[in-house]
């Protein structure tokens, strides 16, 4: 007998227009402003992190929480955010998300200590998880004509894709010419303008369907992920440390309980059928696992460029542009043309191998490598960017193919959650690998200034080598799980479902 979910509510939907809303394009501007905040804050603090660490006195072990707190809260609550928007109204939750995001940004900018900053970043992630799915749903409501809706989603995708690059540049400019705190303060005026613009969005109206919020599933799923990430962050003291072992066991048990709960509740947060399918489950892994290396790479290269090569924050942001450009070109130009002619598995595996080759090039970094940007960093970023970009489109295609219409939103949300959660796990794990390798190097070679620099770079390269292994493992999983026979069945069985809003 199915157990009753925790909370049910009469859902509130945005009122559909009788004809095209004359203010729809202005409404899209409001939505895009909010989405830019969400995407930009995933990278804007990266460039400022060395300055943040010095100013607030963070340890090398704890610095990763500036990134992880945001991505973990965002990814872990994204599925719930869609349900909350359904229950209480998309425009209302969108406005609450913007307001909360702006206030959390002010709190982070004024943070007097690391703990306050970590809390603010987590709150940013919570409110981002509320407004992001509401934004997608509002675009569906605003644009009823298929042609206009396609254009709107195209612009939305461009902002989502370009926001990361904008964040890197903005982080460099704000840190160098103002202060790292402005990387967070800058969100407040944008959030205020978007909040005032909410009146341009469709009003919410009630419907007769009941929407149930799976709070036990949310608590178990997010709690399990937090425990595992915390264990990774504390593993510098050794994987056999009692605290680390307890956290890992707790995290695994909570995730097992989450899986059991999702099989029993009437309206699960994550429908088991979405992830039980072999190709879809493999695709979610393919989307999430590479983020371990990608997010870690942002962290280590930022410190390498500023701390070892003495790049300014602005120059650091510019130095990252080839990576973002490679992802955009790989996804929108190369993969878009190859996917109709190439099996997704073939394209995914080839792209992952290219990204692994680029990452492997970075394992040869040294403190005094001549012309290191031209000989190592630039070609590596191009390979990684093109590889990740060419991998994402076919992986998203197979992740959402043949999904039941009522589960399409959940499948799309899992794709987004996998990226954020993979990044959170990656930053925590690779930061621990790096600091552990550095500590071991210094124990063997002493702590002279030269040895400290060498040990720091050694830690980066060991962590990057670990990321290479993750990419190769992902390629193997893609080859095994996304098999040609199942792909053929998917392609002939039904058309793929376009990723919908998270539910």
Swiss-Prot record:
The chain crosses the membrane at residues 25-45, 65-85, 93-113, 123-143, 153-173, 182-202, 213-233, 242-262, 281-301, 314-334, 347-367, 372-392, 423-443, 462-482. It comes from Streptomyces alboniger. It is a multi-pass membrane protein. May be involved in active puromycin efflux energized by a proton-dependent electrochemical gradient. In addition, it could be implicated in secreting N-acetylpuromycin, the last intermediate of the puromycin biosynthesis pathway, to the environment. This is Puromycin resistance protein pur8. The keyword Transmembrane helix applies. Residues 46-64, 114-122, 174-181, 234-241, 302-313, 368-371, 444-461 are extracellular. Pfam families: MFS_1. GO terms for biological process: antibiotic biosynthetic process; response to antibiotic. One of its GO terms (molecular function) is transmembrane transporter activity. Residues 1-24, 86-92, 144-152, 203-212, 263-280, 335-346, 393-422, 483-503 are cytoplasmic. GO terms for cellular component: plasma membrane. It comes from the Bacteria. InterPro entries: MFS, MFS_dom, MFS_trans_sf, Sugar_transporter_CS. It is found in: Cell membrane. Belongs to the major facilitator superfamily. EmrB family.
């Amino acid at each position: 007998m199915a157990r009753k979910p925790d909370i049910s509510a009469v859902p509130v939907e945005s009122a559909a227009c009788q004809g095209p809303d004359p203010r729809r394009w202005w409404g899209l501007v409001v939505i895009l402003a909010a989405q830019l905040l969400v995407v930009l804050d995933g990278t804007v603090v990266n460039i400022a992190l060395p300055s943040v660490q010095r100013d607030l006195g963070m340890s090398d072990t704890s610095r990763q929480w500036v990134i992880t707190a945001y991505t973990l809260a965002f990814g872990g609550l994204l599925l719930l955010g869609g349900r909350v928007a359904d229950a209480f109204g998309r425009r209302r939750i969108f406005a609450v998300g913007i307001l909360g995001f702006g206030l959390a940004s002010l709190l982070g900018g004024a943070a007097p200590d690391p703990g306050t900053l970590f809390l603010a970043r987590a709150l940013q992630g919570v409110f981002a998880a509320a407004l992001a799915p509401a934004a997608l749903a509002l675009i569906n409501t605003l644009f009823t004509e298929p042609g206009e809706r396609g254009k709107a989603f195209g612009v939305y995708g461009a902002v989502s894709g370009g926001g990361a690059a904008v964040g890197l540049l903005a982080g460099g400019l704000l840190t160098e010419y103002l202060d790292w705190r402005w990387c967070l303060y800058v969100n407040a005026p944008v959030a205020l303008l978007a909040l005032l613009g909410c009146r341009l969005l469709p009003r919410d109206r009630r419907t007769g369907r009941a929407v149930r919020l799976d709070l036990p599933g949310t608590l178990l799923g997010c709690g399990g992920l937090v425990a595992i990430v915390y264990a990774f962050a504390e593993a510098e003291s050794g994987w056999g440390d009692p605290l680390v072992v307890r956290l890992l066991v707790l995290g695994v048990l909570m995730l097992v309980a989450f899986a059991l709960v999702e099989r029993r509740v009437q309206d699960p947060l994550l429908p088991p059928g979405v992830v039980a399918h072999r190709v879809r489950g493999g695709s979610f892994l393919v989307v999430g696992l590479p983020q371990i290396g990608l997010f870690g790479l942002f962290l280590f290269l930022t410190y390498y460029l500023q701390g070892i090569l003495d790049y300014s924050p602005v120059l650091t942001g510019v130095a990252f542009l080839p990576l973002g450009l490679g992802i955009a070109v790989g996804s929108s130009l190369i993969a878009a043309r190859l996917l109709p002619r190439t099996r997704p598995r073939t394209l995914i595996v080839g792209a992952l191998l290219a990204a692994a080759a680029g990452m492997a090039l970075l394992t040869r970094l040294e403190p005094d490598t001549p012309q290191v940007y031209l000989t190592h960093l630039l070609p590596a970023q191009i390979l990684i960017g093109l590889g990740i970009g060419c991998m994402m489109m076919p992986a998203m295609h197979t992740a959402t193919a043949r999904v039941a219409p009522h589960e399409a939103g959940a499948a799309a949300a899992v794709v987004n959650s996998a990226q954020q959660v993979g990044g959170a796990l990656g930053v925590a794990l690779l930061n621990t690998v790096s600091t552990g390798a550095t500590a071991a190097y210094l124990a063997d070679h002493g702590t002279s200034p030269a040895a400290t620099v060498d040990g720091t770079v050694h830690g980066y390269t060991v962590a990057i080598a670990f990321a290479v292994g993750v990419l190769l493992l992902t390629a193997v999983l893609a080859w095994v799980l996304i098999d040609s026979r199942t792909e053929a069945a998917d392609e002939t069985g039904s058309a793929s479902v376009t990723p919908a809003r998270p539910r």
